[in-house]
Amino acid sequence: EHIEQKKAIYERYKEGLKGLPVSMNPMDLENSEPNYWLSCLIIDKEAMCKQVRGEQDVCYVKESGKSCPTEILEAIASINAEGRPIWKPMHMQPIYRLNPFVVRDGNGRAKSNAYIAGDVADVGMDIFTRGLCLPSDNKMTVEQQDRIIEVIRACFE
């Protein structure tokens, strides 16, 4: 019953956010059976407004037709709903910051610099930058979830 409630939450988000430049949790339904623990989204790269996340502070610049996780989290917090950033990858944590980590092209240390041309090869950092966990409590009402969806849609206007 719990998994069915979580699945219904996920499906309502997926349907309600259709048409926005976002992707919901990717899953391989042929080879796995998801538990729908969290409903998460990732904003498409071209739909991201400018955002910088520090250790404790974050700032962003609102752009028409674009949004970022910080804007969405602030917007849903304004209606008393709680989301959160996707977990920060281990190699970005202060204690591990200087250690090597693996990316598609080998060691990722010193390849995630703003001055190096090209796409980010660090998939974990990219997901952290563009993703967020949506309110997913199974005690949330359909009306509350509809309001959250409405607020998220407004962030992209």
Residue ranges of model-derived segments:
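PLP-dependent aminotransferase class I/II
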Residues: 1-157
